[in-house]
């Protein structure tokens, strides 16, 4: 009986399952055929729901100078509009409005009057009124002009110092989709790093509204903001270079000019001013997209004698006291090499030949070396190839020489082409005991969290000359300045080499006009402890040697004054380079004892027992006398006496402490708001310092 009952129950269950199955099939068939559930049309319902994906834009990183002064940032931009025939307040006095806006928008009064006279509801005051900054907007708002209003645009890039270092910084433009794209200079080279990575958020919404459907999932990926880039440029020195180039352009009508200052020991580019330049806030001012520092190739002239003479010394082919007959030299093929002083200076020594820039002396030495040897030295110095500096469109020049005549002219910088950045790299051999150092322009890259992701540092390219060779070159480079009063600088010991190169004619041969030359100068100072290399070149300056030299020496004097580089303060230890270790988590007393012999200026912050932070970090280099900041695990911190500190040093001090900082002026600290020795309240205090230039 039990077995029969079980069978009946099983059949009943199977029947129920089958009925449910057919019921579900029937329901699904109904839904498919009718597109309805409980009277709701599914197609209409689905059509009313949409997946929205919104871009979360990353903030573009800023660009700073080496001392933390902002050079490029991202700001809101606006378009100036004028209501003419609207139901709002219209422009009441068109002539007065045009006259007031003309200087601010850099548009003619006539053009503005033309726009304001249109028979329209409103007009945009383009081009000058398009994409203006908040600073310009505020200037216009102060005028309280009736009928003038603003439309907010996409964000744009703003360059605080206009034409300042324009080819180095470059520019970025806002595209139609709102993205800011780097186009030139650092903005272009590091576009990806500055841009960061956009994020997004995805969610469901009804098409009838802009709101997210409640209780539905949202997929979000945060934007990763772009990193900030700190250049090696010192704004104070850059301003000096800019002033010098401006003089070359406007006083001497120079076709183009470049004035670059490089740290003699590390290769950091401290300043580089050029003509032409442009205002990156107005891309209409760009007439030339090539940077004269890295993209212009030219015959350098007699500055190349630094390297042909040094190569002869290195190869044992040079005796400075040996004499030769100056004036002219005839090569085997009949080519006559002449000195700039056609009659020559009589029979003179090779040392004097360098000081007087004798082409005959350079040719004689080059013939002793031969094509292969001189070519090898030029190649080892970095000519004929890119230096690899962090800028696009770097040219390589041409140092090819085959024949005796090409060897001769290459020894004094004719028949070969170089770039200014190559000259600076090669000159670094004269300040690093014969070792060539790679130039660089990025000091560090800092991500959105404040982490240093890249630290620029000294990079060795190749050892080319011995210490003995460099010492001899210093001796004869000093003579160049000693025998020529135009290159002497008060209170600054300077050595260098001048250059005057003929300019190749498109028709063959060379141009022959009065000013058809490229003038150049390579300077190193101070002579005993080189801190800076200055390289200057200009095409067709309409000036005398004295006027040309005065612009350069004035700039050198100002740079030396700013950097506190006088003969009385020179110290051989300043040239010593120290590579730092990691001192974090070490015992303070032990570490200070270890560092004593390195002659570093150590700023110990707090009286704790252990070191919890340092700057610069491990593997960074310092020169003897430069500051190393060490933060200890103290319970309280007292204010340092900051008098005489650079703003970069003050920023480092405040950053490592977490102390808020405000400053004004340029140069070195003159006064500070928190007295030295005062206990710091890091949460509530703000340090204010006033800077001034040294005299």
Task: Give the location of each predicted region.
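Periplasmic/cell-envelope proteins involved in peptidoglycan metabolism and beta-lactam response
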Residues: 1-281, 372-380, 489, 545-562, ...
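Acidic/histidine-enriched alpha-helical segments
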Residues: 111-120, 254-266, 327, 391-395, ...
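Beta-lactam-recognizing serine transpeptidase/beta-lactamase-like catalytic domain environment
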Residues: 70-72, 207-220, 259-301, 307-538
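Ligand-recognition elements built from short beta-strands and adjacent flexible loops
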Residues: 536-551, 555-695
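Extracytoplasmic
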Residues: 56-59, 66, 75-77, 145, ...
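Soluble non-cytosolic domains of exported or imported proteins
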Residues: 58, 88-95, 130-134, 180, ...
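Second-shell loop/turn segments in exported
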Residues: 49-52, 80-90, 98-101, 121-129, ...
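Sec-exported extracytoplasmic/periplasmic mature domains
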Residues: 102-106, 145, 173, 195, ...
């Amino acid at each position: 009986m039990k077995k029969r009952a079980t069978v009946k129950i099983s059949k009943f269950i199977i029947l129920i399952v089958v009925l449910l199955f057919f019921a579900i099939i029937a329901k699904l068939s109904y839904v498919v055929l009718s597109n309805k559930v409980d009277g709701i049309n599914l197609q209409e319902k689905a059509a009313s729901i949409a997946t929205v994906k919104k871009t979360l834009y990353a903030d573009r990183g800023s660009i700073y100078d080496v001392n933390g002064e902002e050079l490029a940032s991202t700001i809101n931009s606006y378009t100036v509009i004028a209501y003419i025939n609207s139901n709002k307040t219209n422009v009441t006095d068109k002539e007065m409005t045009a006259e007031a806006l003309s200087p601010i928008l850099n548009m003619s009064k006539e053009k503005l009057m033309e726009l304001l006279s249109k028979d329209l509801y409103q007009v945009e005051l383009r081009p000058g009124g398009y994409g203006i900054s908040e600073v310009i907007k505020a200037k216009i708002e102060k005028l309280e002009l009736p009928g003038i209003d603003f439309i907010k645009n996409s964000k744009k890039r703003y360059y605080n110092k206009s034409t300042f270092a324009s080819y180095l910084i470059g520019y970025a433009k806002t595209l139609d989709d709102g993205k800011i794209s780097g186009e030139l200079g650092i903005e272009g080279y590091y576009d990806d790093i500055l841009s960061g990575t956009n994020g997004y958020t995805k969610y469901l919404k009804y098409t009838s509204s802009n709101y997210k459907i409640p209780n539905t999932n949202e997929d979000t990926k945060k934007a990763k903001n772009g990193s900030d880039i700190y250049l090696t440029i010192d704004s104070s020195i850059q301003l000096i270079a800019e002033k010098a180039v401006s003089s070359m352009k406007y006083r001497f009508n120079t076709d183009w000019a470049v004035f670059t200052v490089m740290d003699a020991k590390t290769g950091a580019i401290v300043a580089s001013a050029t003509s032409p330049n442009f205002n990156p806030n107005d891309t209409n001012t760009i007439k030339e997209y090539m940077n004269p520092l890295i993209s212009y190739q030219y015959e350098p002239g007699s500055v190349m004698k630094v390297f042909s003479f040094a190569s002869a010394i290195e190869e044992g082919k040079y005796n400075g006291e040996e004499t030769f007959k100056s004036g002219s030299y005839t090569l085997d093929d009949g080519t006559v090499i002449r000195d700039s002083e056609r009659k020559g200076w009589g029979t003179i020594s090779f040392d004097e030949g360098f000081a007087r820039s004798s082409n005959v002396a350079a040719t004689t030495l080059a013939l002793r070396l031969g094509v292969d040897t001189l070519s090898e030295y030029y190649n080892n110095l970095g000519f004929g190839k890119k230096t690899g500096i962090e800028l696009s469109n770097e040219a390589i020049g041409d140092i090819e020489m085959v024949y005796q005549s090409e060897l001769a002219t290459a020894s004094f910088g004719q028949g070969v082409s170089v770039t200014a950045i190559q000259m600076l790299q090669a000159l670094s051999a004269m300040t690093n005991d014969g070792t060539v150092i790679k130039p660089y322009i990025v000091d560090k890259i800092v991500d959105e969290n404040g982490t240093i992701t890249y630290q620029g540092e000294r990079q060795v390219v190749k050892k080319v000359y011995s210490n003995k060779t460099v010492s001899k070159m210093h001796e004869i480079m000093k003579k160049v300045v000693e025998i020529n009063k135009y290159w002497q600088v008060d209170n600054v010991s300077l050595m260098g080499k001048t250059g005057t190169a003929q300019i190749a004619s498109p028709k063959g041969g060379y141009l022959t006009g009065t000013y058809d030359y490229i003038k150049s100068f390579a300077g190193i100072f101070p002579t005993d402890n080189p801190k800076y290399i200055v390289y200057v070149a200009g095409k067709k300056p309409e000036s005398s040697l004295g006027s040309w030299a005065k612009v350069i020496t004035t700039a050198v004097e100002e740079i030396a004054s700013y950097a506190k580089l006088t003969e009385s303060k020179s110290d051989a230890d300043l040239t010593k380079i120290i590579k730092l270790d990691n001192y974090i988590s070490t015992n303070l007393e032990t570490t200070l004892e270890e560092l004593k012999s390195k002659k570093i200026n150590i700023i110990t912050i707090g009286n704790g027992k252990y070191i919890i932070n340092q700057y610069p970090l491990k593997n960074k280099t310092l020169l003897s006398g430069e500051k190393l900041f060490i933060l200890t695990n103290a319970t309280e911190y007292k204010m340092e006496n900051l008098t005489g500190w650079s703003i970069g040093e003050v920023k480092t001090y405040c950053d490592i402490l977490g102390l808020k900082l405000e400053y004004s002026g340029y140069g070195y600290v003159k006064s500070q708001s928190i007295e030295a020795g005062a206990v710091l309240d890091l949460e509530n205090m703000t340090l204010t310092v006033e800077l001034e230039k040294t005299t």
